[in-house]
Amino acid sequence: MTYKADLHVHTAASLDGLSSLEELTAAAKEAGLDAVAITDHNLCTPVPQRLNGVLLIPGCEVSTRQGHVTGLFLEEPLDLEGLRKNGLPQGGDAVEEIHRRGGIAVLAHPYQSPGAASEDFDFRPDCVEGANARAALKVKEANERAAALAQSLGL
């Protein structure tokens, strides 16, 4: 079975999200999406399995010293307080916590900021986000560089 999905969506609970879960799923359905991953910043919000006929994937976007790492398909919330006990966590610590919670770790929009040095990360994600509209608006070649990074990692 094939699904059309957006695996990086923020609700109004994130500083850069504007919509409620109800509004997001209605818009996703109208756009022809079958599923969306709710990945609010540093917040693991429980979500119903479906809303407005759209499959909801539980997730969280974690701010780390190496950029953002998104956890998808989390079976339980991340221990964000434990991760941040000494400030921003290392990316590898976030990946380990995501894996402990049954999730998939995604390096999110690695080149969104000019001069980002994502090649310097000390961990191996399960995936690299290769298409992000906001990243492309900020840095023209961000998505192309992210796709090349994924390919170089064999992902």
For the regions a language model picked out, list residue spans one by one.
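A metal-dependent hydrolase metal-coordination microenvironment
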Residues: 1-104, 115-117, 123, 129-154
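Short, well-ordered beta-to-alpha junction loops that form the rim of enzyme active sites
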Residues: 109-111
